[in-house]
């Protein structure tokens, strides 16, 4: 099922085609996904690093309806916003998905191949005894290595997860960790894995503050990175790069910024990037900082609780 794929875009990411092709190839799918508008919000901030916003007004309850896309180039940022919209649409449970779901307890799944929720990290109050008799929704998925079909708890697939059957019980609060789209299956799988590695490395760093090394900005020779750093520097925005690669061994970099001009605590932004190519990891972290800033200024996303708290706390305290 997984194939060797030839890459054709290397400027600020590794993709199978140019961003212009991504936009052209998927334009007709925007209506299906409910994406009504993709807007350039780069100029809302003074940095000048491309950021776009995509809007899905009819996103399901519990999901955000405004998404952001980042990139070192305009078309890359536009494609990024569009593809995030597709990700979120694909994560929602559609009517066609409900037709494939089965409702059963673990005890009654003995005749099927399934992913046992006992192997997942669950809230401590959900014990094995409770799991055995809890009625869950299960969705058929394909193992990409063995190409065999397994039933997986629907709670771990869909976001937001609202059981379609009243007798089914959610096990945990859902999230979009590891959700990724791509021009081809292999590209989506790779970037989903990168996101999981990235979140894992950041969690370890937050917990123990080890495996960190500051990167000397002046030592970087990559022209794309230099251009991004120069854009921040020209606007008196200090950027610190840290290598927080975990024991997994895939390069993970954080970029944190402090705006000496505005001194707005909500613009104390952080970006994290993971990639097999360290330069791409840095580019992803830097463009995520730009995305975070523009998103806060844009003020349309529903998940800005952190920014509101930081503004309330004040710049000096943060």
Regions found by a protein language model. Give the residues of each.
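Helix-biased "structured C-terminal domain" signature
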Residues: 1-318
């Amino acid at each position: 099922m997984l194939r060797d794929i030839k890459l054709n875009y290397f400027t600020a990411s590794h993709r199978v085609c140019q961003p212009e092709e991504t936009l052209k190839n998927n334009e007709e799918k925007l209506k299906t996904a409910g994406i009504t508008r993709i807007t350039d919000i780069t100029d809302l901030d003074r940095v000048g690093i491309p950021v776009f916003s995509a809007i899905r007004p009819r996103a399901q309850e519990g999901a955000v309806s405004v998404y952001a896309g980042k990139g070192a180039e305009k078309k890359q940022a536009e494609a990024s916003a569009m593809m995030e919209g597709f990700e979120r649409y694909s994560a929602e449970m559609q009517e066609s998905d409900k037709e494939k779901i089965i409702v059963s307890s673990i005890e009654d799944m003995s005749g099927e191949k399934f992913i046992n929720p006992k192997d997942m990290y669950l809230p401590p109050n959900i014990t094995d005894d409770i799991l055995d008799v809890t009625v869950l929704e299960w969705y058929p998925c394909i193992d990409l290595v063995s190409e065999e079909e397994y039933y997986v708890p629907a709670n771990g697939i869909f976001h937001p997860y609202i059981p379609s059957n009243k007798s089914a019980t959610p096990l945990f609060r859902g999230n979009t960790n590891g959700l990724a789209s791509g021009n081809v299956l292999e590209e989506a799988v790779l970037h989903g894995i990168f996101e999981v590695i990235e979140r894992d490395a950041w969690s370890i760093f937050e917990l123990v503050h080890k495996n960190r090394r500051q990167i000397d900005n002046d030592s970087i020779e990559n022209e794309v990175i230099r251009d991004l750093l120069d854009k921040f520097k020209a606007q008196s925005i200090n950027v610190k790069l840290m290598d927080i690669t975990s024991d997994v061994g895939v390069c993970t970099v954080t970029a944190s910024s402090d705006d000496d001009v505005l001194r707005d605590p909500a613009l104390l932004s952080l970006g994290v990037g993971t990639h097999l190519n360290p330069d791409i990891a840095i580019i992803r972290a830097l463009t995520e900082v730009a995305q975070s800033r523009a998103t806060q200024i844009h003020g349309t996303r529903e998940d800005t609780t952190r920014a509101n708290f930081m503004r309330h706390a004040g710049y000096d305290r943060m």
